[in-house]
Amino acid sequence: MTKKTIYFICTGNSCRSQMAEGWAKQILAEDWNVYSAGIETHGVNPKAIEAMKEVGIDISNHTSDLIDNNIIKNSNLVVTLCSDADVNCPSLPANVKKEHWGFDNPAGKPWSEFQRVRDEIKIAIENFKSR
């Protein structure tokens, strides 16, 4: 069976989309190729790396990438993770489905916010898998 492609997008490809990519590569790897990107690149937030490390997922080798139109056009699903990405997402080919899963931006917030958002993203991906 050919794997489908899921593309997670947020503003800076720094926190939410990085954590989503990390979770999805663990939870969806059997059926999905997983990528993430941003409208801009802000570098991977060290607290996002630490939050994922806390649950045994290493995203320290991830890079902060701009949206790649080749990945978009070959995706089955594009998931925006913040309102900025939802509004500014490039137009998608008709065959690419888009969903918006809004999460708070933990950047600049207390450590507990990174943990909360990380855990909310995991739940969303588990719910997606069970659809």
From Swiss-Prot:
It is found in: Cytoplasm. The active site is at 10 (nucleophile), 82 (nucleophile), 89 (nucleophile). This is Arsenate reductase. Belongs to the low molecular weight phosphotyrosine protein phosphatase family. Thioredoxin-coupled ArsC subfamily. Its EC number is 1.20.4.4. It catalyses: arsenate + [thioredoxin]-dithiol + H(+) = arsenite + [thioredoxin]-disulfide + H2O. Catalyzes the reduction of arsenate [As(V)] to arsenite [As(III)]. GO terms for cellular component: cytoplasm. InterPro entries: Arsenate_reductase_ArsC (IPR014064), Ptyr_pPase (IPR023485), Ptyr_pPase_sf (IPR036196). It comes from the Bacteria. Keywords: Arsenical resistance, Cytoplasm, Disulfide bond, Oxidoreductase, Redox-active center. It holds the Pfam family LMWPc. One of its GO terms (biological process) is response to arsenic-containing substance. One of its GO terms (molecular function) is protein tyrosine phosphatase activity. It is an enzyme of class 1 (oxidoreductase). Its main location: cytoplasm. It comes from Staphylococcus aureus (strain bovine RF122 / ET3-1). Disulfide bonds join 10-82, 82-89. HAMAP family: Arsenate_reduct.
